[in-house]
Regions:
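N-terminal ligand-binding/catalytic initiation module
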Residues: 1-36
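Short, glycine-/Ser/Thr-/acidic-enriched flexible segments
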Residues: 2, 53-54, 73-74, 97, ...
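Short glycine/threonine-rich loop-to-helix capping motif typified by GTGT followed
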Residues: 4-9, 73-82, 162-163, 186
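Conserved helix-loop functional segments at active or binding sites
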Residues: 16, 51-56, 139, 154, ...
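Glycine-rich phosphate/diphosphate-binding loop of Rossmann-like nucleotide-binding domains
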Residues: 34-142
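Short, surface-exposed connector motifs at secondary-structure boundaries
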Residues: 59-63, 143-146, 164-172
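Structural motif
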Residues: 67, 147-149, 174
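Rossmann-fold NAD(P)-binding glycine/threonine-rich loop
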Residues: 152-190
Length: 190
């Protein structure tokens, strides 16, 4: 839940206390020396990488199914770019559970839930009643997708998840979060 507003406050306090205008925090607004498109950069970049990986295998993202974990900036903008590139994202999650929408995630609903209402991802069912919400469990063993994008948290994709993804035919696992795949799972996927 930390955004430009909170970072701006911390940066303002740093500037007030230290009397310096230095770039000590990432995620600042433009008026504080932040970067344009910072919010979208990680999610978009993840998809540009994924697109290039697909090309290496003679494939494209067009028509592929993607599982995304998380519902923060990285996940939201990864979903957005994936949809722009012709893929169908079927999952998003938060710390309480995950949603599977086989028709494709309604990104406008996710943005309203997470960015406007600051709600939980289970509220997605109010927008798309045909979707499925699963509380508590990890999503990686529950879905069959072409691409898996862990964008939620560290160590979220475990060895059993990696084995399930491979068994289900997932072609690519690309990391959006910081170290979301455990070492054991990473070694298995290689």
């Amino acid at each position: 839940g930390t955004g430009a507003r909170e970072i701006g406050y911390m940066f303002g306090q740093y500037k007030r206390i230290r009397g310096m205008f230095e770039g000590v925090l990432t995620g600042k607004g433009l008026s504080y020396g932040g970067s344009l498109a910072r919010t979208e950069a990680t999610g978009y970049g993840l998809l540009y990488l994924t697109e290039e990986l697909m090309k290496c295998h003679g494939e494209s993202l067009e028509g592929k199914t993607i599982a995304v974990s998380g519902a923060g900036n990285v996940a939201i903008y990864a979903c957005e770019k994936a949809q722009q590139l012709g893929a169908k994202v079927i999952t998003v999650s938060d710390s309480n559970g995950y949603v599977v929408d086989e028709e494709g995630i309604d990104l406008a609903a996710v943005k309203e839930i997470k960015e406007v209402k600051r709600g939980r991802i289970k509220d997605y069912l109010n927008y798309r009643p045909n979707a499925k919400y699963v509380e508590g469990a990890g999503l990686w063993q529950a879905v069959k997708v072409d691409v898996a994008l862990p964008c939620a948290t560290q160590n979220e994709l475990l060895i059993d998840d990696a084995k399930a993804l491979v068994a289900n035919g997932t072609m690519i696992v690309a990391e959006g979060a910081n170290m979301p795949t455990t070492l054991e799972a990473t070694q298995y996927l290689q």
